[in-house]
UniProtKB/Swiss-Prot annotation:
The keyword Methyltransferase applies. Residues 216-457 are annotated as: Uroporphyrinogen-III C-methyltransferase. Keywords: Cobalamin biosynthesis, Lyase, Methyltransferase, Multifunctional enzyme, NAD, Oxidoreductase, Phosphoprotein, Porphyrin biosynthesis, S-adenosyl-L-methionine, Transferase. The keyword Phosphoprotein applies. This is Siroheme synthase. It catalyses: uroporphyrinogen III + 2 S-adenosyl-L-methionine = precorrin-2 + 2 S-adenosyl-L-homocysteine + H(+); precorrin-2 + NAD(+) = sirohydrochlorin + NADH + 2 H(+); siroheme + 2 H(+) = sirohydrochlorin + Fe(2+). NCBIfam families: cobA_cysG_Cterm, cysG_Nterm, PRK06136.1, PRK10637.1. It comes from the Bacteria. Gene3D superfamilies: Cobalt-precorrin-4 Transmethylase, Domain 1, Methyltransferase, Cobalt-precorrin-4 Transmethylase, Domain 2, NAD(P)-binding Rossmann-like Domain, Sirohaem synthase, dimerisation domain, Siroheme synthase, domain 2. It comes from Salmonella typhi. In the N-terminal section; belongs to the precorrin-2 dehydrogenase / sirohydrochlorin ferrochelatase family. GO terms for molecular function: NAD binding; precorrin-2 dehydrogenase activity; sirohydrochlorin ferrochelatase activity; uroporphyrin-III C-methyltransferase activity. SUPFAM superfamilies: NAD(P)-binding Rossmann-fold domains (SSF51735), Siroheme synthase middle domains-like (SSF75615), Tetrapyrrole methylase (SSF53790).
Amino acid sequence: MDHLPIFCQLRDRDCLIVGGGDVAERKARLLLEAGARLTVNALTFIPQFTVWVNEGMLTLVEGPFDETLLDSCWLAIAATDDDTVNQRVSEAAESRRIFCNVVDAPKAASFIMPSIIDRSPLMVAVSSGGTSPVLARLLREKLESLLPQHLGQVARYAGQLRARVKKQFATMGERRRFWEKFFVNDRLAQSLANADEKAVNATTEHLFSEPLDHRGEVVLVGAGPGDAGLLTLKGLQQIQQADIVVYDRLVSDDIMNLVRRDADRVFVGKRAGYHCVPQEEINQILLREAQKGKRVVRLKGGDPFIFGRGGEELETLCHAGIPFSVVPGITAASGCSAYSGIPLTHRDYAQSVRLVTGHLKTGGELDWENLAAEKQTLVFYMGLNQAATIQEKLIAFGMEANMPVALVENGTSVKQRVVHGVLTQLGELAQQVESPALIIVGRVVALRDKLNWFSNH
């Protein structure tokens, strides 16, 4: 280990920055956020420094580097574009045993500045030891996505409750279980973010009053249409907090690789016309695991409330009194159309879009007359096996036979394939495509030749 990570208490302590440009401004912003009493020494200053002076936030000393400014300092930063000046600052600080950071010259510095994730009072610092700042920044961005913006408020509130927790729970094990419940409680986090004091108090009292071995909860999470980059931040956070993940065939391997390593995984995949696990059994799996006190994530492709039977699963939990929540996902219609260069609505061609199930039950009948109307886009989910029927019915109820159609297979993934033609070819085109696939019908499909971008990458 070349550098020891430490967190400095700089509030009301003298610090010096030498330099008045953009880099110095970024460093000054960090020190000001930490509460430092800051002096900036430079020949010239960008306008932001004048703003800070007018607000009484720092002191400017215009002119060449004056090493006597270091005499009362706790910490210094050399941030000029002159290597000679930066070296002088470093040597002067070293002679006074003052820690000094030299921008872009880690070997000349006695400390380096990490990439920072600020969820005060929670702070995360990422450093490559000065060898690869870009790598540190990329790692910071990944970690940013895992930590909710309101996490700092939750941590601060936890500090206010420490004495009460210590008083109410006698053992370390009890306290640990309480804090585990506390930090994964979405209702509390959202109430704190909304500054809803009444809801915060109610949720807090509930946490203190319920047994520590209470029943678990289920979070219904939409995984999006395939591309792992389309999983929402909240969805990612939930699957990384799960004790068990119950998932289906439409959840990609890339997304499953993001699941917490020690979480149990239960596959309940389905295919049209064949159910690996009956829906009632899935409902019972969710119920049984939650009753064991586990945090269960039901992970579904697309959005769980759009042809995902999410409502049915939650009704079972609701009847049993199991707490649940829902994290929406990008539905296949939105993701597949965007990655195919097909806008679902367009001022000239479609003023509405209709999402339709093609998985028709025996005796079921769609409102074909309205579906065949002009100026709209139709998106059929699970429609491959019914493609010939969809073609026949739409034409019979007045849709033009040459209406553009597209079938999107494995949408948004690297395996995406788009087959397109006109309505009279729909049944034939469906024979060329494998599930999972989406059928899009409407004049907007003709825009694909202009707007297709994904296949070019």
